[in-house]
Amino acid sequence: MTSAVGTSGTAITSRVHSLNRPNMVSVGTIVWLSSELMFFAGLFAFYFSARAQAGGNWPPPPTELNLYQAVPVTLVLIASSFTCQMGVFAAERGDIFGLRRWYVITFLMGLFFVLGQAYEYRNLMSHGTSIPSSAYGSVFYLATGFHGLHVTGGLIAFIFLLVRTGMSKFTPAQATASIVVSYYWHFVDIVWIALFTVIYFIR
């Protein structure tokens, strides 16, 4: 019986390891993320254009960004890329429990980021910074808002994957899905690092 279990586990691991080869799902995801990159490049261009036209102080009064709040939230999001990758490694080993554990942690870290961003929005709006208040308000909420929507989309993907892996036997298709979700999550993390640098340090 032990031999049968070992053989079964080896077979699953072997099938999962075959996912290291390029497949159409992964390639399609990379192509789609490339188009998303162009979208965010447009947002960056819009931001710098608004900055050049505004002149003077940027952000304009009364807007004051809270760097001490933004840094911890950003660090948590960056760390979530590492926990996400640990989940991928578990999936490649055929370790469903490891995958779920690391992806739950990643989900919670992503949720923390979204809640932190919502809290910052609340503070800025309470001090008069809104979309119609200034050009800065428009580009700030547009850029960070679209990124926040992408993070939320990633959280939904994590929920879908966790439910899917909990309702059926772990398969190579599910491992592929976990890898695709990780591509997306790493993408939104990298975009945020760029946004964070531009918004909080390049003025």
Curated annotation (Swiss-Prot):
Keyword Transmembrane assigned: yes
Entry-linked InterPro entries: Cyt_c/ubiquinol_Oxase_su3 (IPR024791), Cyt_c_oxidase-like_su3 (IPR000298), Cyt_c_oxidase_su3-like_sf (IPR035973), Cyt_c_oxidase_su3_a-hlx (IPR013833)
Keywords, alphabetical: Acetylation, Cell membrane, Membrane, Translocase, Transmembrane, Transmembrane helix
Main location: membrane
Source taxon at top rank: Bacteria
GO biological process, one term: aerobic respiration
Modified residues (N-acetylthreonine): T2
Compartments (UniProt record): Cell membrane
Reactions catalysed according to its record: 4 Fe(II)-[cytochrome c] + O2 + 8 H(+)(in) = 4 Fe(III)-[cytochrome c] + 2 H2O + 4 H(+)(out)
Cellular component per GO, a single term: plasma membrane
Entry membrane topology: Multi-pass membrane protein
Listed EC numbers: 7.1.1.9
UniProt xrefs under Gene3D superfamilies: Cytochrome c oxidase, subunit III, four-helix bundle
Transmembrane stretches, start-end: 30-50, 71-91, 96-116, 143-163, 179-199
Coiled coil: none
Pfam families on file: COX3
GO molecular function (one): cytochrome-c oxidase activity
Family membership: Belongs to the cytochrome c oxidase subunit 3 family.
Protein's name according to its UniProt entry: Probable cytochrome c oxidase subunit 3
Protein source organism: Mycobacterium tuberculosis (strain ATCC 25618 / H37Rv)
Underlying gene: ctaE
